[in-house]
A protein has these predicted regions:
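Hydrophobic packing residues within well-ordered alpha-helices of enzyme cores
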Residues: 25, 50-54, 177, 256, ...
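Short hydrophobic/aromatic-enriched beta-strand-loop microsegments
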Residues: 59-67, 186-190, 246-251, 264-266
Length: 282
C-alpha cells in the first residue's frame, strides 16, 4: 500500500458552515487511518479551539495556530510564540481604537471586553433588527462565545500567545492595521469570513502551514510525494505548496482553487468522503 500523510484544515473543510463535522467525514478519517494512512489536522485554530467533538474523531497529530503549534501522537514537538512586549503593544493599540480581538494561546482563548459584541455586530450587519435572521445569525458561534467565557477569569500569560485575531471595520480598516504591524509580523486578512473583510490575524513571521507541514514530513521521515492536503482558505495556499497533492473544497477561495490539483464537494455534501474514495484511501 502507498501510505499517505493527509493534512486537513478545520473550518470550512472538515466542518460545515454551522461548525459541525459530517458523519461521512468522521467515517472517512477513521477508515483511512485503519488502512494505515496518517491524518493530521492543519488549522489556524489554537489548541483550546480544537474542541472535543473534533478530537474524538482521532488524529495522528495536530498543526495548530496556523503552524505555530505542532503535536505528534499527543506530544508537543514545536511551539512558537509572539514576543510579550509586542503582544502588549498590540493590545494597547486595539484598546485605543476599540477594535475587538482575542489572544490565542495554548492556555486558553482570551477575548477583549467588546469581543463578543463586535463579532455579533459584524455578523448581523445588513439584517433587519428583530428579524429571525438577525436573532439567529450568530448561532454557529455560540460554542466560541462559551469558550471565551470559560477563560474569562483565568490569568493571561502574555508570553505564551501564538497569534492575535481581530475584528475591525471600515472605520479602522485591515490595511491600516497591517501597515502598523507588518514589519514585525505576518498579517492575514479575513481568516474567518463571518468577521468581515476588515478582520484578520497577526502571526509570528516565518510561521505558516508550509513550514509546519515540511516539519512534520521531516519528523516522520516521509517524502512530499506521499502527502495530500484539504483546505478552503487563502491561508491554505502555503499548505498546498508544501504537499504533493492539494484538494480544495467547492466553497474554497478562488486563489486557493487556482493552486489546487482537484476540487471536491463542500463538507455538507460529503466532500472529504467523496475525495477519499476517489483516491482509494478507504
Amino acid at each position: 500500500m502507498n501510505k499517505k500523510v493527509i493534512f486537513i484544515d478545520v473550518d470550512g473543510t472538515l466542518t460545515t458552515p454551522d461548525g459541525k463535522v459530517p458523519s461521512s467525514a468522521r467515517h472517512a478519517i477513521r477508515a483511512a487511518r485503519e488502512n494505515g494512512h496518517i491524518v493530521y489536522l492543519c488549522t489556524g485554530r489554537s489548541r483550546p479551539e480544537i474542541i472535543s467533538s473534533i478530537l474524538e474523531i482521532g488524529f495522528d497529530g495536530i498543526i495548530g495556530a496556523g503552524g505555530g503549534y505542532i503535536e505528534v501522537n499527543n506530544e508537543l514537538v514545536y511551539h512558537q510564540t509572539m514576543p510579550e512586549d509586542a503582544v502588549r503593544q498590540i493590545i494597547a493599540y486595539f484598546h485605543r481604537y476599540q477594535i475587538g480581538y482575542y489572544l490565542e494561546s495554548n492556555d486558553g482563548l482570551f477575548g477583549s471586553e467588546n469581543c463578543k459584541d463586535v463579532i455579533r455586530k459584524r455578523i448581523t450587519e445588513g439584517l433587519p433588527e428583530g428579524s429571525e435572521a438577525f436573532e439567529n445569525a450568530d448561532l454557529e458561534f455560540h460554542w466560541f462565545y462559551q469558550l471565551l467565557d470559560s477563560y474569562q477569569h483565568k490569568a493571561i500569560d502574555y508570553g505564551n500567545v501564538n497569534k492575535i485575531s481581530f475584528i475591525s471595520s471600515k472605520a479602522h480598516p485591515f490595511q491600516e492595521i497591517s501597515n502598523t504591524f507588518d514589519k514585525e509580523f505576518t498579517m492575514y486578512r479575513t481568516t474567518v469570513a463571518q468577521f468581515g473583510s476588515e478582520s484578520g490575524e497577526i502571526a509570528v513571521k516565518g510561521v505558516d502551514k508550509y513550514k509546519a507541514v515540511e516539519f512534520v514530513l521531516d519528523y516522520l521521515q516521509i517524502s512530499k510525494e506521499q502527502s495530500m492536503a484539504y483546505g478552503d482558505g487563502d491561508n491554505d495556499i502555503k499548505m498546498f505548496e508544501a504537499v504533493h497533492y492539494g484538494i480544495a473544497m467547492e466553497n474554497a477561495t478562488e486563489d486557493l482553487k487556482k493552486v489546487a490539483k482537484e476540487i471536491t464537494s463542500k463538507a455538507e455534501n460529503d466532500g472529504l468522503m467523496r475525495s477519499f474514495k476517489r483516491h482509494q484511501l478507504l
